[in-house]
Amino acid sequence: MIQRQTYLNVADNSGAKKVQVIGIPYAPRKYATLGDVVTVTVKEALPQGNAKKGKIYRAIIVRTAKEVRRPDGSYIKFDDNACVLLNQYGEPLGTRVLGPIAREVRNKGFTKIASLAPEVV
């Protein structure tokens, strides 16, 4: 359950460490969940990384601390809120994805991110 002003960890090697959600496009909702695309701004970044502090990117949410109910009745939740930064074409900005990601990301059509992840839960 992600809303505006929420800080997210970045689960790729794009150079950004923490981002803040500034918008939830494509949905007239207040909250975003697993597999949703949000607009973020970089708050912490590594100096040699591709993503620079203050820049605005699109990102897909891959982990949430709030549990999400699946169609089979099970629930999935993670220890943190995390995202993967996207370029203007919807492809991941980094070349690696760190940590597990939710199956909902693959189901929403982001197969490239799912293939880069070490584990799809």
From Swiss-Prot:
Superkingdom of origin organism: Bacteria
Q: Annotated Gene Ontology MF terms? A: large ribosomal subunit rRNA binding; structural constituent of ribosome
Pfam families for this protein: Ribosomal_L14
The family database entries (SUPFAM superfamilies) matched by this protein are listed as: Ribosomal protein L14
Which InterPro entries does UniProt cross-reference here? Ribosomal_uL14 (IPR000218), Ribosomal_uL14_bac-type (IPR005745), Ribosomal_uL14_CS (IPR019972), Ribosomal_uL14_sf (IPR036853)
What keywords does the record list, in alphabetical order?
Answer: Ribonucleoprotein, Ribosomal protein, RNA-binding, rRNA-binding
Entry GO terms, CC: cytosolic large ribosomal subunit
GO process annotations (BP): translation
Q: What does this protein do?
A: Binds to 23S rRNA. Forms part of two intersubunit bridges in the 70S ribosome.
Spell out the subunit comment. Part of the 50S ribosomal subunit. Forms a cluster with proteins L3 and L19. In the 70S ribosome, L14 and L19 interact and together make contacts with the 16S rRNA in bridges B5 and B8.
Family as reported in the entry's similarity comment: Belongs to the universal ribosomal protein uL14 family.
State the name under which the record lists this protein.
Answer: Large ribosomal subunit protein uL14
**Which lineage do the record's taxonomy fields give for this organism?**
Bacteria, Pseudomonadati, Aquificota, Aquificia, Aquificales
> Gene encoding this polypeptide?
rplN
